[in-house]
């Protein structure tokens, strides 16, 4: 994905395309149903978003069941994570979504899920700070990867309720010119993104499979 420099939050009064919002809401709702059916969004965990334009994103309202979303469960925020035209409360982790949109110009959908596999992997690999994925055919799902003879590291960042601190940790990884297709948060889950919702869903499915393989290998070797 193309990395850009961070941009400041825009005025929340700027207009956005209502038709684009409606289309994004439907894509987010469909993703929630699909991922919920796969067991990736237990309870009211997880959060999803899509870019509306350079200044706004559509994001899930905090505390909603992601497998049973309606258009009323999708709201608009600016790139500073502030609600636009709504008294609803966006996900507490909205800044992680807007950070991705600011840093990756071609990211148009962000998914964060909490599967058992993702959560266990985040705990197991937290001391190392990353999960190393080598030699998997499925790595070719990520843009720019054309062979199984490749290696990517999935960083595992310490969990915190202070989102600016977590944003800075992610940004430090990007500034170090390390490839980034997604990241884990210790004891929490995974963030990944795509040029559209379909690609973001493929990335979630790929990470779920690859992390499961790494956990199985650990068990078999023990």
Question: What do these predicted ranges mean?
Answer:
Residues 2-222:
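Glycine-rich flexible loops
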């Amino acid at each position: 994905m193309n990395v850009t420099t961070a941009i400041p939050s825009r005025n929340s009064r700027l207009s956005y395309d209502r038709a684009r919002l409606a289309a994004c809401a439907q894509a987010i709702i469909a993703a929630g149903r699909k991922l919920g059916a796969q067991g990736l969004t237990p309870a009211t965990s997880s959060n999803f978003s899509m870019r509306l334009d350079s200044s706004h994103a559509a994001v899930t309202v905090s505390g909603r069941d992601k497998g049973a979303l309606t258009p009323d469960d999708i709201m608009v925020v600016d790139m500073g994570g502030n609600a636009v035209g709504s008294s609803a409360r966006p996900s507490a982790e909205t800044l992680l979504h807007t950070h991705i949109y600011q840093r990756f110009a071609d990211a148009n959908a962000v998914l964060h899920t909490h599967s058992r596999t993702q959560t266990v992997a985040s705990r197991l690999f937290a001391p190392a700070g990353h999960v190393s994925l080598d030699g998997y055919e499925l790595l070719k799902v990520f843009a720019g990867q054309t062979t199984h003879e490749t290696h990517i590291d999935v960083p595992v960042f310490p969990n915190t309720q202070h989102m600016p601190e977590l944003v800075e940790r992610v940004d430090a990884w990007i500034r170090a010119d390390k490839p980034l297709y997604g990241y884990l948060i210790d004891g929490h889950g995974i963030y990944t993104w795509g040029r559209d919702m379909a690609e973001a869903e493929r990335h979630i499915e790929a990470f779920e499979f690859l992390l499961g393989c790494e956990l199985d290998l650990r068990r078999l070797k023990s």
